[in-house]
Swiss-Prot record:
Native organism: Conus marmoreus
Manganese among keywords: no
UniProt cross-references to InterPro entries, sorted A to Z: Conotoxin, Conotoxin_a-typ_CS
Superkingdom as given in the UniProt entry: Eukaryota
Protein name per its UniProtKB record: Conotoxin Mr3.4
Amino acid sequence: MSKLGVLLTICLLLFPLTAVPLDGDQPADRPAERMQDDISSERHPFFDRSKQCCHLPACRFGCTPCCW
């Protein structure tokens, strides 16, 4: 078991986790841009243009406003 600990310590010293480059283009890192890129409700495939709202099943997938 101590050999495994030594190996793990050596690996962490040679390649620390902070050296891993983070991908700054991921949407989770930029919530404001993610909201701008989000599909608008009027263009949502389940948006009912005649009622100007989304049916209940579509509301579960982020389409708003909902037809109640």
